[in-house]
């Protein structure tokens, strides 16, 4: 009579008297990438919950792979039971407690109050001192208010380098440039650098992962020009290894938003660099043209002995050349400098997404390693004369591989969840910044082009007097008065475009009066007064001579 239960030849493998008991407790796996955050205590409870759930699932998988296999009915029942006990995916509250904790809303507010430049010429340009006030409710700070905090640009750079490597979940905003094309001694440079650092602080304070890092507290509370990163951070890959890994095809990314985001950021990076090169070339050519315009105007000034109109016209041409030089500088200071910040930030975002690809590739390797350890353990089960020590070693390796896979899985989930949120924030910042840069570039260009028009209108009446018909005979505008010397920029609008919009008197005065009015009018008035005195003296002398001749 045969038994209804099939015979299992490996049923006695689990009765190993030398095997160590299975440990049910496990360490939390969902840790931050930097390992130095001072806010980790508040995440321990939630992370241990998620880690224990996944550890139990991992232990069940190990036991299912190496535990005894009963008959077909028992195995089917156990599989159904395991499917019912399958752990669920951790929620966003578990993965990112910094963003989901509504009870603890930590803030960090900073207001830039000044900018100082001292030291050598290189130090003044590349290492200015930023002065700011700070208020916060973070527990990592010793107090809530900080006044007149002074930090050099080099200290800001040290902080950025640490945060960019330590916090792999975030797109750490890059520092603005330490100087602008306006020149370090100009008021425009001071105002723009101050405004850019204020924008940088605003972006930094919007990221809860950054402000909760204890290195930010060390930075603000340290003395002036003494800060160096306290904690150490190590990049995933650098140097030749990083260049080699970037040549490989990126792993499959099931998150469509991030899979399409990196090519977009790279295209922004490449296009912005191309625009910078073209703007630089245009600016250089314009400055070469300015030299020719100044030489051309000086040649007319040298002809003043023939007619005073040449002197006035030459001075106007020289002033027009100077305005073209200002326009070339404004193009660089507005649009070129704006694109420079976009290039830096796009590169940092692109490298952060590349680090995520490295973690995805490490996770794939960890999954393959875990599967190989499971296959090795199953092969050990098929042998009856296997050494129990080898079985224990295989179990330990399998558990270590499963734990490594679990750590990388939670790490990737944390990075992915936070990058999806910051993707929208970065795109909105990029659109707003490029819009403001183009607006400033356009308004400055219009302003100085109108000033150039105002200068040319100064000699319009003199040039028309050179023609008996007023210089308008070939244009067919006979109704226009020959003595019209009014400027085209009025409160009613621009007469060249036919617009009749109401405008403020302040911008009209700014356009109708240029930086060269004092020089032009002073020299012209002096020339006219000297010329009139000479003319009157010659008339008296002529009259006296005529009177003497009649006697």
From Swiss-Prot:
It comes from the Eukaryota. It is a peripheral membrane protein. Residues 1-100, 474-504 are annotated as: Disordered. Gene3D superfamilies: Arfaptin homology (AH) domain/BAR domain, Phox-like domain. PANTHER family: VACUOLAR PROTEIN SORTING-ASSOCIATED PROTEIN 17. Component of the retromer complex which consists of VPS29, VPS26, VPS35, VPS5 and VPS17. Component of a retromer subcomplex consisting of VPS5 and VPS17. The C-terminal half, which contain the coiled-coils domains, is necessary and sufficient for interaction with VPS5. This is Vacuolar protein sorting-associated protein 17. It comes from Saccharomyces cerevisiae (strain ATCC 204508 / S288c) (Baker's yeast).
């Amino acid at each position: 009579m045969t038994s209804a239960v099939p015979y299992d030849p490996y049923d006695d493998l689990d009765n190993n008297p030398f095997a160590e008991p299975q440990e049910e407790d496990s360490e939390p796996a969902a840790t931050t990438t930097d390992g130095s955050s001072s806010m980790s205590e508040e995440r321990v409870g939630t992370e241990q919950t998620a880690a224990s759930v996944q550890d139990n699932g991992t232990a069940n998988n190990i036991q299912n792979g190496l535990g005894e296999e009963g008959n077909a009915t028992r195995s089917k029942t156990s599989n159904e039971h395991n499917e019912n006990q399958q752990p669920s995916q951790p929620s966003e509250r578990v993965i990112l407690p910094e963003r989901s904790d509504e009870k603890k809303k930590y803030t960090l507010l900073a207001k830039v109050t000044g900018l100082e430049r001292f030291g050598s010429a290189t130090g003044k340009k590349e290492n200015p001192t930023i002065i700011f006030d700070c208020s916060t409710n973070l527990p990592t700070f010793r107090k809530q208010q900080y006044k007149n905090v002074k930090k050099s640009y080099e200290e800001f750079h040290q902080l950025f380098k640490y945060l960019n490597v330590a916090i792999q979940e975030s797109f750490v905003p890059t520092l603005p440039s330490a100087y602008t094309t306006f020149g370090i001694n100009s008021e425009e440079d001071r105002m723009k650098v101050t405004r850019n650092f204020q924008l940088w602080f605003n972006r930094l304070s919007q990221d809860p992962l950054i402000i909760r890092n204890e290195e930010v507290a060390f930075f603000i509370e340290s003395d002036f020009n003494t800060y160096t990163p306290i904690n150490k951070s190590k990049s995933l890959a650098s140097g030749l290894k990083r260049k080699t890994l970037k040549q490989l095809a990126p792993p499959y990314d099931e998150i469509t938003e991030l899979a399409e985001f990196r090519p977009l950021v790279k295209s922004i990076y490449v296009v912005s660099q191309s625009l910078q090169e073209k703007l630089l070339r245009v600016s250089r050519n314009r400055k070469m043209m300015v030299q020719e315009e100044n030489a051309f105007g000086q040649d007319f000034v040298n002809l003043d002995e023939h007619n005073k109109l040449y002197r006035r016209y030459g001075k106007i041409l020289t002033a027009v050349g100077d305005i073209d030089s200002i326009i070339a500088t404004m193009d660089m200071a507005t649009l070129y400098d704006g694109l420079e910040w976009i290039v830096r930030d796009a590169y940092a975002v692109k490298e952060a997404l590349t680090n995520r690809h490295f973690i995805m590739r490490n996770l794939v390797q960890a999954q393959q390693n875990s599967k190989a350890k499971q296959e090795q353990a199953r092969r050990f089960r098929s042998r009856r004369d296997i050494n129990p020590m080898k079985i224990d070693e295989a179990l330990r390796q399998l558990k270590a591989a499963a734990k490594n896979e679990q750590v990388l899985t939670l790490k990737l989930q944390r990075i992915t969840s936070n990058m999806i949120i910051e993707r929208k924030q970065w795109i909105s910042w990029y659109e707003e910044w490029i819009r403001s840069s183009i607006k400033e570039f356009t308004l400055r260009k219009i302003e100085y082009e109108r000033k150039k028009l105002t200068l040319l209108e100064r000699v319009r009446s003199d040039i028309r007097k050179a023609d008996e018909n007023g210089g308008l005979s070939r244009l067919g505008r006979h109704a226009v008065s020959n003595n019209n010397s009014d400027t085209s920029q009025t409160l009613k609008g621009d007469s060249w475009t036919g617009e009749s919009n109401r405008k403020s008197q302040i911008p009209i005065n700014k356009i109708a009066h240029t930086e060269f009015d004092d020089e032009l009018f002073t020299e012209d008035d002096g020339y006219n007064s000297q010329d009139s005195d000479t003319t009157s003296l010659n008339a008296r002398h002529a009259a006296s001579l005529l009177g003497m001749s009649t006697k």
